[in-house]
Every structure is written in C-alpha cells, then in structure tokens.
Design a protein with these regions (language model features):
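Non-transmembrane "mature" sequence context
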Residues: 1-90
Length: 90
C-alpha cells in the first residue's frame, strides 16, 4: 500500500504493537502526512537516530517549542523543529 511505501522510503515511521505495524495517528492529518515530518525524519536519520529514538524525540515535550516536536509540526512550526533536529547532529 501507499503507507507501506512511505515507511520504506523513510517518509513515515511505523512500529510494532502486538505484532502489527502501526503509524502514529499524529503523523497524519486530513491531507496526508504532516508537513515537515519527512524532512525532519531525514535529518534525524542522518544524525544517527534509530527509529525508536526518532519516535521518542518526536513525542517528548520540549519546553522551548513549547510542546513536543510532533505537536509543533502539526501547528506549522516545522522550521523550529528542523533547527532543533539539525542541532542534535552536532
């Protein structure tokens, strides 16, 4: 399916829950993948993050945003999120 292809291409993250691959609902909106998520995943992957580490980072509250990175992406603050992700690489 299209979702499986997006996971394979690195545009989405999925994890196993009770043996079934799932994509967090917050990664999607009415138009598809949340704007800025694929680029953020690429930056984190290039910084050496595992899929588990990326999921944890995206859902961990960052008081400087405020909120979690995925919440910031969902409210169109992708540049701030991407800057923070890039800073992790150094």
């Amino acid at each position: 399916t299209r979702v499986h292809q997006m996971v394979r291409d690195g545009h989405l993250l999925a994890f196993r829950r009770d043996g079934v691959m799932v994509v967090p609902a917050l990664f999607l909106n009415g138009e598809g993948v949340v704007k800025g998520l694929p680029g953020t995943l690429t930056v984190l992957r290039d910084a050496g993050f595992s899929a588990e580490e990326m999921l944890r980072w995206l859902f961990t509250v960052d008081d400087s945003l405020p909120g979690s990175p995925i919440e910031a992406l969902r409210t169109n603050r992708g540049r701030e999120v991407k800057r923070r992700a890039q800073a992790l690489a150094f």
